[in-house]
Amino acid sequence: MANIKQQKKRNKTNEKRRLQNVSFKSSVKTVVKQVKTAVANADKQKALALLSVAYKKFDKGVSKRVYHANFSARNKSDLQKLVNTL
């Protein structure tokens, strides 16, 4: 446990951000799974709609500094390749 007052404050904000990041990452994973399920079911319209949602979430994650830009680009590319197989 920290003894310095400012570090105690930082610990609170760090925990708050950590929980927000975990929640955000979970929502991104859910959308990615939905895209993969739509591709498995050969539902191109649904896959394309969910793909745009996934792109938006990945870009938002980069701007919020939850994800590194390369991680986001790699995942978006992989999802696009998957949807292009339809």
From Swiss-Prot:
GO biological process assignments: translation
The annotated region (Disordered) lies at 1-21
- Under the GO molecular function aspect, what terms does this record hold? small ribosomal subunit rRNA binding; structural constituent of ribosome
**Which Gene Ontology terms of cellular component type are present?**
cytosol; small ribosomal subunit
Family affiliation: Belongs to the bacterial ribosomal protein bS20 family.
**NCBIfam families given in the database record:** S20
Q: What's this protein's function?
A: Binds directly to 16S ribosomal RNA.
Please report the name of this protein according to its UniProt entry. Answer: Small ribosomal subunit protein bS20
Q: Which organism is it from?
A: Onion yellows phytoplasma (strain OY-M)
Q: What is the lineage of its organism?
A: Bacteria, Bacillati, Mycoplasmatota, Mollicutes, Acholeplasmatales
